[in-house]
């Protein structure tokens, strides 16, 4: 059955100027936006993101790749899955590929989305060609953070009756580096604002269960790990652990960049993605290559 293509507004207030009205595929419980042709690259957003987080990539890479950016389950126009776990998220990524008519794809993940990419590569290795892992980590709590305390801190605003729209600007400015433009911030705030509170809550409950350190060596897909030199959420040290544990990885550290590399320096990020995925034309693995 062909995918239904509908036009929907991605964002309403408070930042309708930055709403992205475009072709969005809605197939069953999953929604995604796609652009371009070529080898498929699936973009997986972070905890406070949505498919709109990837607009610079959807526009900047569409001449080389079929770019697919989803709303993860419980976010945007995608219905929740219960329980929300890394296993059910990975299975949802595989279901997205099925519904998009894709056998094997590159996965590009930011932060929480990078964790999704890792779990998908472990759970559905035959579906994954190459990985781009930006501002992410191989495990929660590498700095000793207590999961219960972290959840309580992240949920305090929602427990007090605030919405994602209420907290979006403060959260994003606290994690971004100085290179984030006003327009890029507005786009990210608008995307965060459309996250349902229930979806954000479920994601916060899920995230501390992430730990794939002992299984990284089982991932055969070549990986590009991108870290921000100013990232305090997932510091460079986390990316080094990740790159060291993978079979075939290279690590790039972007000086002066915080936790939102895909939005802070989109042209640089797109160039890295274009070069790395381009080396895997035909969706076949390549030999190891390191860049520190």
PLM features: what roles do these ranges have?
Residues 249-292:
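Catalytic active-site module of serine/aspartate enzymes centered on a nucleophile-bearing elbow/loop
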Residues 109, 113, 117:
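Gly/Ala-rich beta-loop-alpha elbow adjacent to hydrolase catalytic centers
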Residues 142-148, 161-217:
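Conserved alpha/beta-hydrolase catalytic His-Asp/Glu region
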Residues 28-79, 96:
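Conserved HGGG/HGGXW glycine-rich cap/lid loop of the alpha/beta-hydrolase fold
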Residues 88-105:
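Conserved acidic catalytic loop of the alpha/beta-hydrolase fold
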Residues 219, 225-227:
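Short beta-strand/loop motif that positions the catalytic acidic residue
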Residues 118, 122-123, 129-160:
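Flexible "cap/lid" loop of the alpha/beta hydrolase fold
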Residues 229-234:
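Acidic catalytic loop of the alpha/beta-hydrolase fold
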